[in-house]
């Protein structure tokens, strides 16, 4: 498979009045052409910060990439100037944000907002840009695009606004599309339509998608590969089948176990006890150790290396170490 993006040992920190928050700590993954790569995890785990780092949209005065590389077309995005990133952002790498209403300019028509990207990045004439806008609105399922492009965002429903935001992200035919919680603000019926739209667009354009979400139901429908993120680190990466049917990390198992089951009457929810670690002063060992039911002494002291279970499945957990069974049996486990 053709690799289109490589994130290597990414570290991002935020400077606050209370100290330095280590939001992302050593994140690494590759993205391949035409795939949907989902990053899942609870709020504050660093998944959105990772996507903002790729887009070059981190707050300039408080956030900083302190280490690592983001390689795209033989360029390290972390080393590019603002001017160079503006040439890539929107043209080669686009992003869909959570709330379509705040992502659109209420004072400009939909046609003007979609056409602006073509005029800037593709240097098209207004006539050619209008033709492209009509085609894109049709692709994302906007009825009567010739009339709708003259309208303003407030004249569209929430689902239609999200379709317009998707059209805006795809208008310049990017190589990578980052979707940050694209269905959070939508009801279940509209959510299903948008997810089906994602599948259709990917079939037609072969765009690579990074999906940022906490909704495992969404992941199960559209993702090819899944990364489970916790406290700024990758806990487990695998195919959708690996993660849903053969989870190895205790946090991944906890996430799946906490999802309500509609097929089991009266089934109790299984919460994950405890709280995430303080990222002002993260622990030296596994960040999930304090909440882990299989905790060992080594988990508190040293961060586990990556265990490769297959070509598609990697886990960062001491339980994958060959010595783990002996450690538990010898009484190294903590209560």
Swiss-Prot record:
Instruction: Look up the record and report any one GO term of the cellular component aspect.
Output: plasma membrane
Q: List the disulfide bonds.
A: none
Annotated EC: 7.4.2.9
The record's section on InterPro entries has:
AAA+_ATPase, ABC_Ni/Peptide_Import, ABC_transporter-like_ATP-bd, ABC_transporter-like_CS, Oligopep_ABC_C, P-loop_NTPase
The similarity comment for this entry is:
Belongs to the ABC transporter superfamily.
Q: Which PANTHER family match?
A: DIPEPTIDE TRANSPORT ATP-BINDING PROTEIN DPPD, OLIGOPEPTIDE TRANSPORT ATP-BINDING PROTEIN APPD
Tell me, what does this protein do in biology? Probably part of the ABC transporter DppBCDE involved in dipeptide transport. Responsible for energy coupling to the transport system.
This one is known as Dipeptide transport ATP-binding protein DppD
């Amino acid at each position: 498979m053709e690799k289109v993006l490589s994130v290597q040992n990414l570290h991002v920190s935020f400077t606050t009045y209370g100290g330095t928050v280590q939001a992302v700590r050593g994140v690494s993954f590759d993205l391949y052409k035409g795939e949907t790569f989902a990053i899942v995890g609870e709020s504050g785990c660093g998944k959105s910060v990772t996507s903002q780092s790729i887009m070059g949209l981190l707050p300039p005065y408080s956030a900083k990439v302190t280490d690592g590389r983001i390689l795209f077309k033989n360029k390290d995005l972390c080393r590019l100037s603002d001017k160079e990133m503006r040439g890539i952002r929107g043209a080669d790498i686009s992003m869909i944000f959570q709330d379509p209403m705040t992502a659109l300019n209420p004072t400009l028509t939909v046609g003007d907002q979609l056409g602006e990207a073509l005029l800037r990045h593709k240097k098209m004439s207004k006539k050619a840009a209008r033709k492209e806008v009509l085609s894109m609105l049709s692709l994302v399922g906007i009825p009567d695009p010739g009339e709708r492009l003259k309208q303003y965002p407030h004249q569209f429903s929430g689902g239609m606004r999200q379709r317009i935001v998707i059209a805006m992200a795809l208008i310049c035919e990017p190589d990578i599309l980052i979707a940050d919680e694209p269905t959070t603000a939508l009801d279940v019926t509209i959510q299903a339509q948008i997810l089906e739209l994602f599948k259709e667009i990917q079939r037609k354009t072969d765009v690579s998608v990074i999906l940022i979400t906490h909704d495992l139901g969404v992941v199960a429908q559209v993702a090819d590969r899944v990364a489970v993120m916790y406290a700024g680190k990758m806990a487990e990466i695998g195919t959708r089948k690996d993660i849903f049917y053969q989870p190895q990390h205790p946090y991944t198992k906890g996430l799946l176990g906490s999802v309500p089951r509609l097929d089991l009457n009266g089934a109790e929810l299984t919460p994950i006890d405890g709280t995430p670690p303080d990222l002002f002063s993260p622990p030296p060992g596994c960040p999930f150790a304090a909440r882990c039911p299989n905790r060992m002494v080594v988990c508190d002291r040293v961060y586990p290396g990556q265990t490769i279970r297959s070509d598609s499945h990697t886990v960062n957990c001491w339980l994958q170490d060959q010595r783990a069974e002996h450690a538990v049996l010898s009484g190294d486990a903590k209560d």
